[in-house]
């Protein structure tokens, strides 16, 4: 029980920190472009953002270890057969991630200077609800399968894994920016929705929770069918 509580606290702190930090990615990117005089380079924002994600994910991995800030990711690893979690531990960890995200959104909006507030925000629905749900399902499926493939079947070196994760993340973010923000993470979507009191609406639950989980768990089931987990070896009974 204590191990589960420690994991939940780690998840909550990591999600809180990630929401606060990721909310400033736009500010950091703009500052780097301005400082380096990269305004004329059209691909500069994507390269800078990918680099920021790579650096911060590397730092978070060192600080928080195996903690997670994505409920669909935690559930997907469980469904894919990765040892570590149980349904009980997930029932405690997932709400902790949502609480951390809500705290992070409230904190950054409280303490960020007024002149930067227009540059901060979370996922928001850019299309009708059904189109958004389809988009979030596809995006969550894609990013989840990519993450499982990179972490479980990808390169052994941690830096190589982290770079591929950053590249996959920015690719799906760009692909989904005209649809759902995108989120591909129910906790982060919940945090910003809570900030604007829309966390309990059907549109939010349908697009950012139900659709995200359908996509992520479908990816986990497909991954498990392609790469089944090793069967536990039966202990040989000693003959009397």
Swiss-Prot record:
Summary of the tissues where the protein is detected: Expressed in roots and above ground. Expressed in elongating regions of the root tips, trichome cells of the rosette leaves, vascular tissues of the flower petals, stigma, stamens (anthers and filaments), pollen and the top and bottom (receptacle) of siliques.
GO molecular function: water channel activity
Entry keyword set: Endoplasmic reticulum, Membrane, Repeat, Transmembrane, Transmembrane helix, Transport
Pfam families in the cross-refs: MIP
Annotated membrane topology: Multi-pass membrane protein
Keyword ATP-binding: no
Subcellular localization(s) per the UniProt record: Endoplasmic reticulum membrane
GO CC annotation: endoplasmic reticulum; endoplasmic reticulum membrane
Motif NPA 2, chain ranges: 185-187
Bilayer-spanning residue ranges: 13-33, 44-64, 89-109, 132-152, 163-183, 203-223
Positions of short motif NPA 1: 70-72
Predominant location category: endoplasmic reticulum
Domain observations: Aquaporins contain two tandem repeats each containing three membrane-spanning domains and a pore-forming loop with the signature motif Asn-Pro-Ala/Thr (NPA).
Role played: Water channel required to facilitate the transport of water across cell membrane.
Stated family: Belongs to the MIP/aquaporin (TC 1.A.8) family. SIP (TC 1.A.8.10) subfamily.
Entry protein name: Aquaporin SIP1-1
